[in-house]
Amino acid sequence: MRSSSTLLIAFGLFLASMSVEAIIRPGYGSGGHRPPSSYHGGHHNDDDCTTKPPKSTSTPSTSTSTPTTTTTTTTTTTTTPTTTTTTTTTTTPEPTTTKVKVCPQGYTSFLRTPAADNSFTSEWCMQLIWSPRQPMPINNASALCQASNTEAVVTTFANEEELNVFSLQMAQQFDRVGPATRGAIAVDGRRIAACVSRDRGILDSEECNGTNSFVMVDKHTSPGFTWSKWATNEPSANAWTYDIEQCIQFTVYPALTGPGDNPYNMLNRNNKFNDIYCNMDKAPNEPTNTAYWNFGALCGVLPS
């Protein structure tokens, strides 16, 4: 009996547990969830309310490694050597002949400072030419110069150096040849036309007073030096009958030679300039005084 009772009790408990589960889990037929198969003790797929994930089919991935072929292209640069041909041309230059300008025969070269008042002359050729006629009027001086050279003109000194050269020549000539121990030569310079007058008012005016009354005929010599070397009280513009002192002479009076010589003339006329008559060969007021005689002319020309 005990076994039967035990069985009955166990069965009753089973039923009780089933009722409780039915209450807790609604039935599948009324729209509830189907109990899992484990609930019924089976393994039917249709009884499982859990949606199982789809089976994944793994297709094994096959990696095919294609070998990469790297082609290396080697560029070879060939340098063609450049041959430079140097042609040497020998040019024989034409000989250049630079003509050196020289003074005519008998003339001496003197260097000068070029300036506007000497026509920018840098070299001037000069010669003292003695006249075959002694004394001679200054108006003959131009022809005397041109007889030695057709381009020559009557000229004068530009500086002390030139003066000393020809002053010495004159003194030596007078001492060696004569006919006098002192004398003069014709040089460039003329009284301007407006100052050729016997009227002392005109001659003593500012325009005609002293140096202002003279100009150089030839333009290759600056006049300043000559104008600074006038003898005492010269130019005097003396007049004589039909003539007036319009030309210039250069006098050398080296020494007193006799009791009749005038020391004043020696001191004040040696190596000095004096205005004199152009058409006379002697001073009419002192015809025997050789200091006023012209024995030649100072000539000048450009080198060529």
UniProtKB/Swiss-Prot annotation:
Residues 1-19 form the signal peptide. Residues 29-100 are annotated as: Disordered. The keyword Amino-acid biosynthesis does not apply. Keywords: Signal. Residues 51-99 have a biased composition (Low complexity). This is C-type lectin domain-containing protein 141. It comes from Caenorhabditis elegans. The gene is clec-141.
